[in-house]
Amino acid sequence: MKQLVTAALLLTLTLFNNTLFSQPLEWQSRGIGGGGALFAPSVNPINDAEMYIGCDMTEVFHTTNSGLSWNTVGFNELLSVTTSKVQFTSDNLIRYAVNFDFFTEASFPVKSTDGGNTWSPITDPTGGECYAIFADDNSTQRVVIASYNRIYFSSNGGTTFTNIYTNMGSGAAHVGGVFFDGTNIYI
């Protein structure tokens, strides 16, 4: 019996000893990944080395070196919404996005005036149901936002919005994209 206990102890020590040395000495980043799906990439038209991409785990990832390294935008500044991406404008400091509030479960439009370092809410005519935002990359003032049954337009950087479309039926105001062409806007 004593030999059996000794053999079991030696076997156990051998197995645990091997696992101690099988761990990597250091971790290496292999790119972005939030533990979930990544979606809605956006590339800065003024500086194509700068990009944002959202994750369904609420992180927003940001790179300024063409993806060689990524940082997470602070969760107290911007949380990812699966149908929204960061929108760039003609001024590299002014950007728009849709933010999410876990406590109220509201999705609302936000604006950055410092190149994405901080984000502040703008007027939200959707009452917390904003699912998409589109900004004119040749202007800082023209913004389109969509809820599930309405589409709104702002000509003053989100200070005020005008309802430009309402679907009271099935709630089908899904916007797949917006094309700004001078004074014309195609939705």
Question: How should these model regions be labeled?
Answer:
Residues 1-24:
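Bacterial Sec-dependent N-terminal signal peptides
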